[in-house]
Amino acid sequence: IQFAIDELKLDDDMLVIAGDNVLDFSLTKFIEYAKGKNTSCIMRYYESDEKKLLKCGVVTIDESDKILNMTEKSPNPATHWCCPPFYYYTKSDAKLVQKGIDSGCGTDAPGSYIAWLCKQTTVHAMEMAGKRYDIGNLESYEKVKSEYKGIEY
C-alpha cells in the first residue's frame, strides 16, 4: 500500500480491497458510510464457524461501530466479528501508513495496519451488506464460478 501511495503520489481517501475476493454487493453504501462517519472504516460480518475465525482478523466494537480492538488470526478470538480485507482510509490516515509500517505493521498484511490505526485514532466497522467470496485456491475458484450471481444493489 505504501508503495502505491509513493509511486502514484496518492493524496486522497483510499479504498483498498484484496484482489482475491469477489463481492455480491455494491461498495457504494460502504463508501457513503465511511464518508458519513468521517473516519477510516472496514467491513465486518458475523462468523459463527470457530475454525474460520482463527484464520481472519476479528474486531471488538462499541454500540456506534467504533473499533475497540482488532486482532489478526488470534488463537482465542474475542468476538465473532470477522473482518474481510476491505478498507477505506481517510486521506489523513493514508498518510500514516508508513508510520504504521515503522511501528511494526506487516507490509503484506493490511489488517495489521487497521489493528495499529484503531489505537491511534477512531476507526469504524460497518456490517457487510452481502456476501464475499474468498478465492484462495482452485477449489474455491470453482465454487465461486458455480455460485456467484453478480452484484446486487
Enumerate the language-model features and the residues they cover:
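Conserved beta-loop-beta/alpha segment of the NTase-like Rossmann-fold superfamily
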Residues: 1-62
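Catalytic-core segments of class I nucleotidyltransferases/pyrophosphorylases
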Residues: 22, 31-35, 66-134, 138-153
